[in-house]
Curated annotation (Swiss-Prot):
Function summary: Regulates the transcription of the pyrimidine nucleotide (pyr) operon in response to exogenous pyrimidines.
Protein name: Bifunctional protein PyrR
Molecular-function GO term, any one: uracil phosphoribosyltransferase activity
Family indicated by similarity: Belongs to the purine/pyrimidine phosphoribosyltransferase family. PyrR subfamily.
Keyword Transcription regulation: yes
Enzyme class: transferase
HAMAP family hit by this protein: PyrR
Residues the entry annotates as binding substrate: T46, R47, R87, D107, D108, V109, I110, F111, S112, G113, R114, T115, R140, V164
Intervals of motif PRPP-binding: 103-115
Domain of life: Bacteria
Single biological process term from Gene Ontology: regulation of DNA-templated transcription
Organism: Thermosynechococcus vestitus (strain NIES-2133 / IAM M-273 / BP-1)
Catalysed transformations (reactions): UMP + diphosphate = 5-phospho-alpha-D-ribose 1-diphosphate + uracil
InterPro entries from the UniProt entry: PRibTrfase_dom, PRTase-like, PyrR, PyrR_bifunctional
């Protein structure tokens, strides 16, 4: 994403992001209760993948359990490629059979719900999970579909023309969340 003119507001600092991920991992563990061995974290490309890995590390610190972590590319499932332009497909890596599992879809920002609809379609091509839970770091509203996260790091009401930017060390050389407001 290129820089845009206007105001940039810090929403989560690196420390805030770390604490939020710890809280989200705790919530997932609590909801899973005795089914921790059935959990699979699937990060949606691009930033959902490193977020899923960070959540997996947090779960391991909390519970001593190592969860399978996968990567989900939804390029061929999108219904909005004509609007957003062509995308280069990324790797889908599903480490275990999803049948009978509890899949936690991990995404950085939920907006219209279209990405998640595409992800749900993709997941079912890899098995029939017992349940699919949605974890979104930021929920900015403006839903076009009846999709709501099971776990939310931060609800952030935004204007449609604003941009929420999740920054991760491995991609952006720093951690945090920013809101970019147009001028």
């Amino acid at each position: 994403m290129t820089a845009m003119a206007g105001e940039v507001v810090e929403i989560l600092s690196a420390d805030d992001l770390r604490r939020t991920l710890t809280r989200l991992a705790s919530q997932v563990v609590e909801k899973a209760r005795d089914a921790l061995d059935k959990l699979v974290l699937l990060g949606i490309h691009t930033r959902g993948v490193p977020l899923a890995k960070l959540l997996g590390q947090q779960v391991e610190q909390l519970e001593g359990a190592s969860l399978p972590i996968g990567e989900l590319d939804i390029t061929f499932y999108r219904d909005d490629l004509d609007r957003i332009g062509p995308r280069t497909p990324r790797q889908t890596l599903i480490p275990v059979d999803l049948s009978g599992r509890i899949v936690v879809l991990v995404d950085d920002v939920i907006f219209s719900g279209r990405t998640i609809r595409s992800a749900l379609n993709a997941v079912h091509d890899y098995g029939r999970p017992n349940a699919i839970w949605l974890l979104a770091l930021i929920d900015r509203g403006h839903r076009e579909l009846p999709i709501h996260p099971d776990f939310t790091g931060k609800a952030l009401p935004t204007a449609r023309d604003e941009v929420v930017k999740v920054l991760l060390q491995g991609i952006d050389q720093r951690d945090g969340v920013e809101l970019w407001k147009p001028s």
